[in-house]
Structures are given as structure tokens and as C-alpha cells.
From Swiss-Prot:
Known partners and oligomeric status: Part of the 30S ribosomal subunit. Contacts proteins S5 and S12.
The encoding gene: rpsH
Name of the protein in question: Small ribosomal subunit protein uS8
Record-annotated disulphide pairs: none
Gene Ontology molecular function terms on file: rRNA binding; structural constituent of ribosome
Free-text function comment from the UniProt entry: One of the primary rRNA binding proteins, it binds directly to 16S rRNA central domain where it helps coordinate assembly of the platform of the 30S subunit.
Protein family membership: Belongs to the universal ribosomal protein uS8 family.
GO cellular component: ribonucleoprotein complex; ribosome
GO biological process: translation
Keywords, sorted A to Z: Ribonucleoprotein, Ribosomal protein, RNA-binding, rRNA-binding
Domain of life: Bacteria
Length: 132
């Protein structure tokens, strides 16, 4: 069975595992999913990410991060641009998530980057998701 929106599936798996206080979640791999997971790691939302090669498409293993008393680091994660309704933003109108406390993940000509990087490089693109 084919999946309509694999990025939404990635975000939903992370959101559900986070809400259930799981330590690890495994997700079917793709290039854009790897990029999104690496951004979440570099921004400190997840502890680690590793790619496991199988003889099909591979698996991304995401290690979730929790604070003191098992408080969630990821408070919210939301898909913005969907297959049925794409959302684009120019470099000067990129969104700020929670006044800069969260990040927007943007797919640009320079690759998949955060809103802060896109502003510094002066590139716009498709607004994939918000994470806070």
C-alpha cells in the first residue's frame, strides 16, 4: 500500500512516541525524512538519529529526548504544507514559530533547512513543518 504523505507519517510517529514517552521510534527511510531527522537532532529536539540499512528502503531510528522528570522536549510538531495544499514562503516572509522559540522546517533550493538558516541565506521555499 502506498502512503499519501510520508512526511506527515514521520511527524505523527515522532509525536505519538513522544506522547507515550517511548525512547526510540523506527520510521521507513527516505532522503527528505533523513534531512528532517538531522535538523531535529541539530536543533536539540531529539537525542540521536541513526540510519539502518536493510535490503529495501532502510529504516531511520530516532532516539527521543526528555528533560528532567521525563518532561517532553518536543511540545508540539505540526505539518504545514500538505500534498493537497502546498504552502510556500519567500525569504522575507518566513514564519517565526512561537516568536523564535520553535523552528520551521523549510525545503529550499539549498536543501532542507530551518527558518533561521533560510533567513540568513535569503532563500524561501516550501514550509514543511513547525516544531516547538
Amino acid at each position: 500500500m502506498s502512503m499519501t504523505d510520508p512526511i506527515a507519517d514521520l511527524l505523527t510517529r515522532i509525536r505519538n512516541a513522544n506522547l507515550a514517552h517511548h525512547e526510540v521510534v523506527e520510521i521507513p527511510a527516505s532522503k527528505i525524512k533523513k534531512s528532517i531527522a538531522e535538523i531535529l537532532k541539530s536543533e536539540g529536539f531529539i537525542r540521536d538519529v541513526e540510519y539502518i540499512e536493510d535490503n529495501k528502503q532502510g529504516v531511520i531510528r530516532v532516539f527521543l529526548k526528555y528533560g528532567e522528570d521525563r518532561n517532553r522536549v518536543i511540545t508540539g510538531i505540526k505539518r504545514i504544507s500538505k500534498p493537497g495544499l502546498r504552502k510556500y514562503a519567500k525569504a522575507d516572509s518566513l514564519p517565526k514559530v512561537l516568536n523564535g522559540l520553535g523552528i520551521a522546517i523549510i525545503s529550499t533550493s539549498a536543501g532542507v533547512i530551518t527558518d533561521k538558516e533560510a533567513r540568513s541565506k535569503q532563500v524561501g521555499g516550501e514550509v514543511i513543518a513547525y516544531v516547538w
